[in-house]
Amino acid sequence: MKKITLLLTTFFLVSACSQNEPETESVPTALVEYVWHKQGPNFNPENLKMVIGSWNTMIDEMQCSSMTGANILTPKVENDGYDLIWVMLWDSQYGRDECWDDWTENQQLNWDKTIKGIMEYDLNNVYLFKPTVGKNPNEENTSGSFVNTFYFCRYNDGYGAADLKSYQTELNNVEGFSDYWWYVTLEPLFEPEEPKPDFVWLDLWGSDADKISDQEIFSKTNLPDQVNKKFSCLPDINGVSFNATAIRR
């Protein structure tokens, strides 16, 4: 994926309306943002808990109401690019940009001191997406932890968005999946590197046990054959999986 800077420029389209035409406001779009981090020599559970608490205090003091939640993702398989990913959920691009401007001007220096030796963020690997929910969970997961898997997929020759929609419809009609499972597709708000995915798929489960159970149900349907026929996903059929902890709600 193409590297982007932390602060993205927001463009506003202003249209002229006649006095007889009512003004219409665009509906804010929810966003999700991923920031790669590497662990430092002083990284441990106690220090991570400390920096999470400090970060939440800073966000509270900023009155950053546009942030609707935050998570930390830890990869199931070691990755050279990151040791953990800090995830932020936003209710709009405008609100996100306001919070980042405030953070950069008033909080970043203190944050850098707080995390020194514990972890460091990578401003060359900050990725913003627009999520679209494909299926909501049957029940809200309030445990504070979950697992998820990302798939970066392209359409095979002769297939396209209509086939993805058809696949989603069939998947959503399968009975027996765990109550906390849900999924979204993610639209990158940056220019991905080649090969560019046609869509990014993200599955979320309440636990590893739920994931294993759901994958067993999935394997007994005709859907795996559809996936192989219609889509090619990277890095492979297993995707990229994480343990996740909610750090702000």
Regions found by a protein language model. Name each.
Residues 4-14:
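Sec-dependent N-terminal signal peptides
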Residues 17-249:
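Short S/T/G/P-rich N-terminal loop/turn motif that feeds into the first structured element of a domain
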